[in-house]
């Protein structure tokens, strides 16, 4: 299991974990967010959320 907390400024660290499953950050209402492709579809990752990759390689987001 691997995890990384999104800080709003660590896109390269998130990209290293998620590869092409994550889209470039975007700015909305004063915050930076990401979109992450999971088995359930695209999920918005907000600053302070934690992205988790389980032992099967699947991603989910913890708030």
Locate the predicted segments by residue:
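N-terminal non-globular leader segments, chiefly Sec-dependent signal peptides
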Residues: 1-39
